[in-house]
C-alpha cells in the first residue's frame, strides 16, 4: 500500500509539512510506504483554459497540453493507493500552489475519473491555518469540492490550526495508520457535490 502526499507549502519544516510527516509516520506504522511531493520544488504552470470554451485536450483526452511537472505527479496519483492533500490556509482557501495544481487536476479528471484512474482512490485533505484558525474549515470545504470533482473517495478532511496543532499531530498519526487499511467513505463511486 502506497500513499502519495502532496504538500502545498513552501516550508519543509512548517506546521503543514510537520502534520503531513505525522500522517506519513502513521501510514508507515500501518505497513504502507509514502512519497511526499513538495509542490514548491516543482514547475507547475497555471491552467491556460485552452480554446474558446476553456477546454482543450484535458476534456477530450484526460491529459494536459502544458509540458511541466504536472504530468509526472498525475501519473503518481494514478498509481497510488491513497492520496493526501496537505495545504496551508490562505484567506480561508488553499495555498496558491495547491490551487494551481488542483485546478489542473480537476480539468484532466472531470467526468473522466474512472478512465484516468482517480475514481474511488481514497483521499484525505489536511488544511492548516496559522492565524486565527477560522479559515481551516472553509479551506477543507473548498478542497473537498475539488477532490470530489476529481473522483476521489474522500475518507477524511482535517482542519487544524496553530492553537490545536500538538493535539492534531497525534490525530494525524492515528489517521495515517487507519488510512493504511484502505478505508472507504461508503459513498457511491463518482459521487459529486453539486457545483453551483
Residue locations for each model-derived region?
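N-terminal beta1-alpha1-beta2 submodule of the flavodoxin-like/Rossmannoid cofactor-binding fold
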Residues: 1-111, 158-160, 164-196
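Short, glycine-/small-residue-rich phosphate/pyrophosphate-handling segment
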Residues: 95-97, 110-156
